[in-house]
Amino acid sequence: MVKVENISKTFESRRKKVVAVDSLSFSAEPKSIFGLLGPNGAGKTTTLRIISTLLKPDRGKTSVMGFDSVVQPTEVRKRIGFLTSDMKLSGNLTPKELLRFYGELNHMRDTDISKRTKELSEYLDMNDFLDKRIGKLSTGMKQKAAIAVSLIHDPEVIIFDEPTNGLDILTARTVTDFLKDYRNQGKTIIISTHIMTVAKKLCNRVGIIFKGRLVEDDTLEGLYEKFGEDNLEDVFFKIADREGVIELV
């Protein structure tokens, strides 16, 4: 389980302060996918980085499986698989070599690394390029490799920032099907996205975020009932209009 409790984060430069996350709270349960849905610059990535121990909040706290992300970052990292929207992989290595490297970083045994590599390669349809250099792979292949790397240690909590961004239809389908399977294995999954179809296909619950504030947190059915609509796009635009940010979407 993941708990986010009243977190805020402000970034400062010489000219101005930018409030990236403003008093934001939500929780994500096992065997579910929670989606943070919002336009670019809404605060989705900052929120995920705070949960994943890569940033510290100015206020509030986050916890993963009962471990505080600030106080117990090592324990949190053991239990999460985090995929950034701009994850960079070494172009000189192969996916197989990367998986071994990250498996060793997670103190896995050789036999477990080999077994897990085989499982992930089959799950993500990677066998044809497992021994090819990352620098020679397509965008979709690189994304699959990045997903596999983030999951090599079989984490209990999965946090993916824009997991289908920039992917072709077939690769995006592979990724969404994979996440559904993982959810059904009892994992806690949080994703960020600005793509409505991804949220509709995957999420048990969505949090809609504008200007760093979580303005709605509900099931899709709950949102449809509340706003008198039967699709997520119309709900989203009604909320954007209400919040005065319709120009952003």
Protein language model annotation of sequence segments:
Residues 217-218:
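ABC ATPase "signature
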Residues 39-43:
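Walker A (P-loop) phosphate-binding loop of ABC-type ATPase nucleotide-binding domains
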Residues 1-4, 10-23, 30, 73:
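A short, flexible loop at the N-terminus of ABC-type nucleotide-binding domains that lies
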Residues 100, 104, 111-129:
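Conserved ABC ATPase "signature" region
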